[in-house]
């Protein structure tokens, strides 16, 4: 029933992914050995969205784990839920991609990709009605970005009508792990624009800010960041896994959020975010959730929605609440901040309600917005890319793996096109649309 196949690649992807499985196992009452220890029938009703049931009654995640070096895999395997995964679904090489996109996409990754695809096929054949794939990866490194995008394009060829959702960690503006991040990210975006259906854009710096500012953590670890991400990931699919009054799924999400096919990069947020100590003092109300979820400080990527306009947005509420109140709040947000929504898409906020809240909360909400301000992120990466590419710095690492400079130029111009598309729709007004069509007609001739 409506399965989602989960794929995680590279160090970042595997760490986010394993955190995500901890959250989902917890929600469905599945212990680290795969046995069901929950208390409610609802946990089992649609457990097969993410799990296969083995013959002995144990639940095995429908997950494929890949990396070009064994290190992260070993730590996943020895982690709290390491024993739950199917051992054959760990696919890894030995050499590593060394933060080099070309190695992940063309050389090392290309050697490993067939064994990954075999596992993906095997998992997909197990499914009743496969809804789509979710991929966790980062765009700054070599494996998640290079091999991740290679896998996405291969899956695209083989399953063209299934949804492809990615959780992509972009390089942060101030915090950089590797000097070649702008190259890797630009080459990846070039692929994601063409081959993914929906990209949830995350970045470490924004997550750090949330940890400092809202959660009051003095020294946030990657574990804390990944916890935020996994809360959002679980929120995106809760409608598939638990009954609700207003359901959404990956395809409905896409139809409601993507006005133009290339503009499928979303900012995500989660509410309520409270510091660990002060959780018990919070009474949650729908207005409070709404306020926190639309707050620019809560966005998990370093772009400020106040600098652009929302093309569309989707709010997924969880918990027992009145749908009437949810609708009122959403209309309220749009009326009060009408300048931040494009006027040529009327009622552009979709809401959905799922009855089961996350563990330890009475209600929660996940926010997904398609805002033109996401271009800040692409523009920033693009500037860093150009600065290095003008001097052809570090290029030999890529050309040495058989890449051509043309590919870089193409990726760069594709990214810049994306930025200007966002800008064009940010500036568009309802009555200007006619002029655009005239202009386009002239250009086409």
UniProtKB/Swiss-Prot annotation:
PROSITE patterns tied to this protein: TUBULIN, TUBULIN_B_AUTOREG
Region (Disordered): 422-445
Keywords, sorted A to Z: Cytoplasm, Cytoskeleton, GTP-binding, Magnesium, Metal-binding, Microtubule, Nucleotide-binding
UniProt-listed Gene3D superfamilies: Helix hairpin bin, Tubulin/FtsZ, C-terminal domain, Tubulin/FtsZ, GTPase domain
Cofactor(s), names only, from the UniProt record: Mg(2+)
Sequence positions that bind GTP: 11, 69, 138, 142-144, 204, 226
Acidic residues composition bias: residue spans: 429-445
InterPro entries per UniProt: Beta-tubulin_BS, Beta_tubulin, Tub_FtsZ_C, Tubulin, Tubulin/FtsZ-like_C, Tubulin/FtsZ_2-layer-sand-dom, Tubulin/FtsZ_GTPase_sf, Tubulin_C
GO MF term list: GTP binding; GTPase activity; metal ion binding; structural constituent of cytoskeleton
Family the entry assigns: Belongs to the tubulin family.
Self-association and partners: Dimer of alpha and beta chains. A typical microtubule is a hollow water-filled tube with an outer diameter of 25 nm and an inner diameter of 15 nM. Alpha-beta heterodimers associate head-to-tail to form protofilaments running lengthwise along the microtubule wall with the beta-tubulin subunit facing the microtubule plus end conferring a structural polarity. Microtubules usually have 13 protofilaments but different protofilament numbers can be found in some organisms and specialized cells.
Function of the molecule: Tubulin is the major constituent of microtubules, a cylinder consisting of laterally associated linear protofilaments composed of alpha- and beta-tubulin heterodimers. Microtubules grow by the addition of GTP-tubulin dimers to the microtubule end, where a stabilizing cap forms. Below the cap, tubulin dimers are in GDP-bound state, owing to GTPase activity of alpha-tubulin.
Name the UniProt record assigns to this protein: Tubulin beta-8 chain
Annotated source species: Zea mays (Maize)
Gene for this chain: TUBB8
């Amino acid at each position: 029933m409506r399965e989602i196949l989960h794929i995680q690649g590279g160090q970042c992807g595997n760490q986010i992914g394993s955190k995500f499985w901890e959250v989902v196992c917890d929600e469905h009452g599945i212990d680290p050995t795969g046995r069901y220890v929950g208390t409610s029938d609802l946990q089992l009703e649609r457990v097969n969205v993410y799990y296969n049931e083995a013959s002995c009654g144990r639940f095995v995640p429908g997950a494929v784990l890949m990396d070009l070096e064994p290190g992260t895999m070993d730590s996943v395997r020895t982690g709290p839920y390491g024993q739950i995964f199917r051992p054959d679904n760990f696919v890894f090489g030995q050499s590593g991609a060394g933060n080099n996109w070309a190695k992940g996409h063309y050389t090392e990754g290309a050697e490993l990709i067939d064994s990954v695809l075999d596992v993906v096929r095997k998992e997909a054949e197990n499914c009743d009605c496969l809804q789509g794939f979710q991929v966790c990866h980062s765009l700054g490194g070599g494996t998640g970005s290079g091999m991740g995008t290679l896998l996405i394009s291969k899956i695209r060829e083989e399953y063209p009508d299934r949804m492809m959702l990615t959780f992509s960690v972009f390089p942060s503006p101030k915090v950089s792990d590797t000097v070649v991040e702008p190259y890797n990210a630009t080459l990846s975006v070039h692929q994601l624009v063409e081959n993914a259906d929906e990209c949830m854009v995350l970045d470490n710096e924004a997550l750090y800010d949330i940890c400092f500012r809202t959660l009051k953590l003095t020294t946030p670890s990657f574990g804390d960041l990944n916890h935020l991400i996994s809360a959002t990931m679980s929120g995106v699919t809760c409608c598939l896994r638990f009954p609700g009054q207003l359901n959404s799924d990956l395809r409905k999400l896409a139809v409601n959020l993507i006005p133009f096919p290339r503009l499928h990069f979303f900012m995500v947020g989660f509410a309520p975010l409270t510091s660990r100590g002060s959780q018990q003092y919070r009474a949650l109300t729908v207005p409070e959730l709404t306020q926190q979820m639309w707050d620019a400080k809560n966005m998990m990527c370093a772009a400020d929605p106040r600098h652009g306009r929302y093309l569309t947005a989707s709010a997924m509420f969880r918990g027992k609440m009145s749908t009437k109140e949810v609708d009122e709040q959403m209309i309220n947000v749009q009326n009060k901040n009408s300048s931040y929504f494009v006027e040529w898409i009327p009622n552009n906020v979709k809401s959905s309600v799922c009855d089961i809240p996350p563990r330890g909360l009475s209600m929660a909400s996940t926010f997904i917005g398609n805002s033109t301000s996401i271009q800040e992120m692409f523009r920033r990466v693009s500037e860093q890319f150009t600065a290095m590419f003008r001097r052809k710095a570090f290029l030999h690492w890529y050309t040495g793996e058989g890449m051509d400079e043309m590919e870089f130029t193409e990726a760069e111009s594709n990214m810049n096109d994306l930025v200007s598309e966002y800008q064009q729709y940010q500036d568009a007004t309802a009555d200007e649309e006619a002029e655009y069509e005239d202009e386009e007609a002239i250009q086409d001739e």
